[in-house]
Structures are given as structure tokens and as C-alpha cells.
Swiss-Prot record:
GO cellular component: spliceosomal snRNP complex
Quaternary assembly: Possibly a heterodimer of p31 and p34. p31/p34 could also associate with CABP1A/CABP1B to form an active complex.
Annotated Gene3D superfamilies: sav2460 like domains
Compositionally skewed regions (Pro residues) per UniProt: 49-60
Protein name, entry field: cAMP-binding protein 2
Subcellular location per the Swiss-Prot or TrEMBL entry: Nucleus
Amino acid sequence: MYNPPPPSGSQGNNNYYRQPSSTPGVSNPNPQANQFLPPPPSNTQAPRPGFPPSAPPPSAPAGQYSMPPPPQQQQQAGQYGMPPPPSGSGIGTGVSLVKDQQISLSKEDPYLRKLTVGLGWDVNTTPSAPFDLDAVVFMLGANGMVRQPADFIFYNNKQSRDGSIFHHGDNLTGAGDGDDEVVSVNLQAVSPDVTRLVFAVTIHQPELRRQNFGMVPRAFIRIANQETTRNICRYDLTNEGGTNTAMIVGEVYRDPQNPQNWSFIAVGKSFPGGLQFLCQIFGVNAS
């Protein structure tokens, strides 16, 4: 089962993300399944997947929000078309979070309207198999699932239909300091029936390249006010991934008591199965 975060301000919940027992190999993953093997030849490549088909798969496990329905009026969509903010930009360091810790973004910054979400990582390099990590976003409704395939924001679908989210592109190498990939979010333009924005990082072609998050010793997510560039919070992950190939880093979600306010929870939960597994549990057909 996948449950939404508890109300902002509560203590950490280590069972926030739990692997569904009905998914083979998830509740009791084989510890040998993702062990590192020698890297494949450098000329072994496979095409990147395109945008998933329009028909979502059958219902997958999802959490429920016990909250009043959000306002029904549609916000006017925001527009993005600017280049990403400078790598590592932002004023101050913000609040340093630990796993499962939550923070009310609206209380920390009452005038907050637009977010810069920066994600970064360092990797253990292997000469013949360079890493390619991808940041993705799932826009979830109250049932814990995407409403439509277009609610899956990634390198081949960079902007949400309501214009509220813009992915600034795929960094194929992860080289350099600061943010490796950046996502812009206009909170005022997020559709009223979207309650959660899940930010995750996955490894591209993990089986082919014999790679996993145990080879990514440092990763982070930071949340900043895009208009003032002030950093609100940051979560640094330390050896959270093990032999897994997908990681939910954090989540921005509406306050159950006041849907106009937003909070953030540092999740830091990794899974086997890569991007396809995340798509399965959030209702995106990525086959």
C-alpha cells in the first residue's frame, strides 16, 4: 500500500512508502537480484522510451487522502519557457531535512507562488558505462494515481497540460556541482484535483549498464522560491538506494486542512524495477 504523508508537523513515519505485497519480488526482493556485475561493452545502447500510450493500466495500489475536496474552479495555467535557473542557484541554505521529515512550505514562505525544485547527484564512474539518471514527476489525484498519462512529467513530456510544471531537460552525464536537473512548479496553476507532486529519480537502462543506487553515494533535492531564489529546504540522501534502481526523493503535497497551502516531505525511499515500477504503482502505462 502507498499512503499519503501524515499531516504536516507530525513526526516521521517510516512506513510512509510501503511496497505492495501483491507485486512479485517487491515485498521480499531477492538480495542478489541487483548485484553489481562487470560493465557491458561501451557500444551497447538501447533506444530511450517515448511518451507512454494514452490508456492507463488497471488500478494499482494507492493511498487515500481523508480531506475535503479541493475547490472546483480551474486555475489559469502558468506558462514556462525560460532557461533553467543557474546550477546551484539560490539564496541561503534553507532548512536541512532528514528522512521522513516534513515542512510547511507555505508557513516558511507565506508569499510562495512558484517553486524551483533542484535535484543533484554524484556517481561512482565506470569507464565503459556512464551513468544517466533521470528526474521525473508524478502529478497525483486524491486516489494516489495520475489522472491521465500526461500527468507523468519526464524528459519526453516536459510540461504538464495545465502549464504548472516544466521539466528543464535531461542531463545525460550528471557532471558538475549543484543541480543536475531542475523542475519549475507554479503552485497557483496546479489543477485543483491534483493533491500530490511526487519527485523521483531513476537510472536509465540499469540492467544493461549493471548499475544501481548503491553506486550513487550522494544525492539531494532542494526547494526554492523561484521568484526570490531563496532556498526553503534541502534534503541530502546518504546511501539510501542499495541495489535498487528507482528512488522517490520527496513529495510536495497540499495541506489536507487548507488545499491552498503546500508542504514537503523528505521521502528517500528506493525500489527495484526502475522507472517501470514507479509508473505501475502510480497508474502510468509505460510498456
